[in-house]
Regions:
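Short, surface-exposed alpha-helical segments at coil->helix boundaries
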Residues: 6-11, 99, 125, 177
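Conserved, mostly hydrophobic/aromatic
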Residues: 13, 43, 51, 74, ...
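Secondary-structure boundary/capping residues
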Residues: 22, 114, 165-166, 191-193
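Mid-to-C-terminal alpha-helical segments outside catalytic/metal-binding sites
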Residues: 42, 159-164, 174-193
Length: 193
């Protein structure tokens, strides 16, 4: 949530990275592009695969042009980016992570692999279908099943090709085991589970 956390997050990620743990680094909009470039070089050398950004906590809109150089570097290094997408209960009324903003970036940076969290956008499931049409956008399932019923969840998932949906739990806000069990019980083909 602040520029000074960029390197400690990287060091932690580098330390825990392994075959079963794929940690994500982060940068802050106030980090210089030189700092970001150095970090991304070190991250690539360490085998880091992606970057997590949370617009509300980091103080930027997903489609803010000041972030374009960061997205270009993410694209250049072959990383993927995970955006918190949609509503955040700590920031009522904030639109910095709205689904439409992700769509703008997906259209501008067609080689950038994007993961739009919470089945396209937390509490924006009625609008997340626009992301399902973007070939470079994936989604993940974290915490969504705690908010909507199974039928609504399945409908939201259906907006995305099955090979672009990832399992997520948003631990510690939801229990990983419980989310996995609920996923396995969904009335969808096993190949989608």
């Amino acid at each position: 949530t602040k520029p000074s956390q960029m390197l400690p997050i990287f060091e932690f990620c580098r330390h825990i990275a392994g075959e079963r743990i794929v940690p994500l680094i982060s940068v802050h909009p106030d980090n210089t592009m030189n700092e970001v470039g150095v970090l991304f070089t070190r991250a690539a050398e360490a085998g880091i695969k992606g970057v997590k950004l949370h617009p509300m906590y980091q103080g930027f809109a997903i489609d803010d042009r000041k972030m374009y150089p960061v997205y270009q570097l993410i694209e250049h290094f072959g990383f993927f980016v995970v955006f918190h997408t949609g509503y955040d209960m700590a920031f009522p009324g904030n639109t910095q992570a709205d689904v439409e903003r992700v769509k703008t970036i997906a259209d501008q940076f067609t080689d950038l692999t994007i993961v739009s969290t919470h089945v396209g956008g937390w509490r924006q499931w009625d609008r997340s279908g626009v992301l399902g049409k973007c070939r470079n956008v994936y989604t993940e399932t974290s915490i969504t099943m705690t908010e909507i019923n199974d039928d609504q969840f399945i409908e939201a998932l259906s907006q995305f090709d099955e090979d672009r949906v990832l399992f997520g739990s948003d631990s510690p806000w939801s229990d990983q085991k419980e989310m996995l069990e609920r996923t396995l019980c969904l009335r969808i083909p096993d190949r989608r589970k």
